[in-house]
């Protein structure tokens, strides 16, 4: 069930404490996938949340749940425009950037590392990951940390707590709509 996966993997985005989350969703049929995506988006669109399928293969969809207003803010942070320009992003417009990311994902098997920007990872950590080929990090949580370890550890704790609370509330009968904070 798509809603359960969103709660388990994207609670910090629903709670508006993180820009976006990414997860792989197994589906039975294309019709079921698109019906679930459309239903989810209808449910949370007015609260500023959007679910996008970035890539599909072998009945698995790579799903990105985000707050476009937060993504717009993140793409305008100092240094981000110059960083993503190296990967062919000609604009920091969120819709354009997301389409460019989708295109980059279609061109390769692995993840383009700039995806961290879309997931609210600090620019320094994204750059550190690339420069160090994923090695030599200070700590690992939701991402590999190369810069501000203390802040990252606090963020990881907030995200874990949020997910724990959201899973509990969802299991008690709260809907995704009820659990999604308005923008």
What residue spans do the PLM features occupy?
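Short, surface-exposed beta-edge/turn micro-motifs
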Residues: 18-20, 59-61, 112-114
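Generic secondary-structure signature for well-ordered alpha-helical cores
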Residues: 45, 131, 135, 164-168
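Short acidic alpha-helix initiation/capping motifs at coil-to-helix transition points
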Residues: 75-77, 103-110, 133-134
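Internal catalytic-core helix/loop-beta-alpha segment
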Residues: 86-113
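Hydrophobic/aromatic-rich, well-ordered segments within soluble, folded domains that form packed cores
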Residues: 112-137
């Amino acid at each position: 069930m798509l809603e359960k996966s969103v709660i388990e993997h994207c609670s910090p985005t629903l709670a508006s404490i993180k820009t976006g989350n990414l997860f792989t969703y197994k589906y039975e049929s294309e019709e079921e996938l698109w019906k679930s995506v459309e239903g989810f988006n209808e449910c949370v669109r007015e609260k500023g949340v959007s679910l996008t399928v970035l890539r599909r293969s072998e009945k698995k969809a790579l799903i990105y749940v985000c707050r476009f207003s937060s993504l717009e803010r993140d793409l305008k942070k100092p240094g981000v425009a110059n960083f993503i320009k190296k990967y062919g992003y000609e604009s920091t417009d969120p819709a354009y950037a997301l389409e460019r990311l989708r295109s980059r994902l279609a061109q390769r098997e692995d993840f383009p590392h700039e995806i961290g920007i879309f997931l609210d990872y600090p620019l320094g950590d994204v750059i550190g990951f690339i420069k160090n080929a994923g090695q030599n990090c200070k700590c690992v949580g939701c991402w590999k940390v190369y810069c501000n370890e203390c802040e990252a550890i606090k963020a990881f704790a907030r995200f874990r707590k949020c997910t724990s609370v959201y899973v509990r509330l969802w299991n008690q009968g709260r809907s995704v709509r009820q659990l999604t904070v308005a923008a």
